Each structure stands twice: as C-alpha cells, then as structure tokens.
Amino acid sequence: MGDVEKGKRIFIQKCSQCHTVEKGGKHKTGPNLHGLFGRKTGQAAGFTYTEANKNKGIIWGEDTLMEYLENPKKYIPGTKMIFVGIKKKGEREDLIAYLKKATNE
C-alpha cells in the first residue's frame, strides 16, 4: 500500500478539519475514525449519519476506501461529506496506509 508519513500529511491537510483518528477522539463535522477498518458504514457510536451512509452496507477496508476517497458523493449518494475526493491513486494509497495505522492504535 502507501507511505504512512505521506498519508499523515495528507490527513492533516485534507481530513483533520472534520475528522479525528485517536481512540476516544471527538466527533467533529465528520465522525471519529478510530476502529474504521472492518466497520460497516454509518456505525461510529454517537455520530448522526445520513440514511445513505447507514444503508450503504459496506465494510470499510482498503478497497472500499480507495473507491470512496476518490469521489465520496458518487460512492455514497446522499452522504453529508462535502469533500470532493482525492483523484491521485498514490495519495489515496498513502492516506489509507496512515488511516490503517492511526485508527487502530
């Protein structure tokens, strides 16, 4: 997969204004992402999701995140995530490598 350190920089630049990753981290505009891998969409405790997110029914993993992060609104029509996505595959790979580590510590 990608480079964890590059992924951390991408997370700080593009994701951290709306998300946290640490265990017990607070929800912001978007949910805390701790425990993301292996969890179904729309399941972070204490966060209010759209019906689209709750009903998507996929399990978050490398493949689903690769597709979602390229174009969130295309992958889950009706999501309230306003982020336009990351077009460069290498950047998505780096971000996923970071998320895999950071959301599991």
UniProtKB/Swiss-Prot annotation:
Protein keywords: Acetylation, Apoptosis, Electron transport, Heme, Iron, Metal-binding, Mitochondrion, Phosphoprotein, Respiratory chain, Transport
Name the record gives this protein: Cytochrome c
Modified residues (N6-succinyllysine): 56, 73
Residues reported in the UniProt entry to bind heme c: 15, 18-19, 81
Residue positions, PTM N-acetylglycine: 2
Native source species: Saimiri sciureus
PROSITE patterns in UniProt: CYTC
Cross-referenced Pfam families: Cytochrom_C (PF00034)
GO molecular function: electron transfer activity; heme binding; metal ion binding
Protein's UniProt keywords contain Electron transport: yes
Modified residues (N6-acetyllysine): 73, 100
Record InterPro entries: Cyt_c-like_dom, Cyt_c-like_dom_sf, Cyt_c_1A/1B
Localization of this protein: Mitochondrion intermembrane space
Gene Ontology cellular component list: mitochondrial intermembrane space
PTM sites of type Phosphotyrosine: 49, 98
Keyword hit for Acetylation: yes
Family statement: Belongs to the cytochrome c family.
Principal subcellular localization: mitochondrion
PTM remark: Binds 1 heme c group covalently per subunit. Phosphorylation at Tyr-49 and Tyr-98 both reduce by half the turnover in the reaction with cytochrome c oxidase, down-regulating mitochondrial respiration.
GO BP annotation list: apoptotic process
Role according to the record: Electron carrier protein. The oxidized form of the cytochrome c heme group can accept an electron from the heme group of the cytochrome c1 subunit of cytochrome reductase. Cytochrome c then transfers this electron to the cytochrome oxidase complex, the final protein carrier in the mitochondrial electron-transport chain.
PANTHER family membership: CYTOCHROME C
